């Protein structure tokens, strides 16, 4: 897996600019609503990343729409195009469940993959660019950062692209996660993490092991693209996001110890927020416009107190917005879809393709095509999708089709649903399952149902009737008409060729 190498975010921006994938905006633009409007229009048109050099009221530039096209996501992962992300998925599938070598030759063949992983621990630096400027105590003022307000009814400015670094009390490896953070004071943010996410689990374990003690936490903004994307990729629990970022980049991830705690953050990050969560300190978060296209309801989450801000000289603030697809998370979903396919195929070799339509909020609906081998096979695959990766815990609908259907073409999928399904026989309903608390359609916050649709051809045992045979064209006739097609001049305004 040959990787394009970027040492930091600035390296990546330089390459994007050289390829016409970055636009500098010198006109003053307000982080309150205006940047969102410009970024949204640009993303919908397949446009470039945007660097707002003069946000109104601030001296720090704002980077937006960085991963606004699948191509830029692939480039951030060190690949030339989206199709190459299948190779990233194959590597992750191997790391998630490596098969023991079948013999000496197989061991020799697998050795490069093992060496790749073993050679990718982090590189710890004594000093780092992210600590060129340091403020602490009363000098900490988050209002100096051009944090965006994305939608008219949002509760407050919102940090969206922060890499939250945590470590549980019984773990050597750190966790990297991306959780939105509402600004509620000059040194206070609300950490919105769902209970099953790595940061929340680390915090729960800390509270159990150290009652009443402050939980150390750091947030990195503007890390290199491989590290950012490593935090949103289904990395095996045995592999750190930093090590995975090193695999993508082809070089070890450089980290530095924080000023105020023992956590390690990306050395090249533009900005780092250091601080703690006081056990029991909670605050109401929201409402915010989110990836569903609606404002979510208010809920309580822990408060993150910032004690130190470290940053690079001339730091860049990296931000985004979320809204009804398409938005940047939806684009990320389209690209990461290619990573998921080999991981699922490793566990379920019968899967031909897997697709998360972006219009389905990137994870709430999945279409799977399989090489069906027995009656009931589609139901096994549904259950597998819901249970195998925690990324699909909140997928509400799974549609399973045969491999003659294109999972990415709604014409094909709807044809299969309407011709191969009996609603009563082929619909699976599962009640009282975990659901994203942002899903207001569920009857209870965080708990709802799931639906599986078996749109495959039915086998003996699944139906008593003779099954329909698809219409297929006569290949000889097709070849003959191909040969005389131009002479027919049907699309040539009636003129002879």
UniProtKB/Swiss-Prot annotation:
Mn(2+) binds at residues 175, 241. Keywords: Cell membrane, Decarboxylase, Flavoprotein, FMN, Lyase, Manganese, Membrane, Metal-binding, Ubiquinone biosynthesis. It catalyses: a 4-hydroxy-3-(all-trans-polyprenyl)benzoate + H(+) = a 2-(all-trans-polyprenyl)phenol + CO2. Its EC number is 4.1.1.98. GO terms for biological process: ubiquinone biosynthetic process. Belongs to the UbiD family. Catalyzes the decarboxylation of 3-octaprenyl-4-hydroxy benzoate to 2-octaprenylphenol, an intermediate step in ubiquinone biosynthesis. This is 3-octaprenyl-4-hydroxybenzoate carboxy-lyase. It comes from Escherichia coli O157:H7. The gene is ubiD.
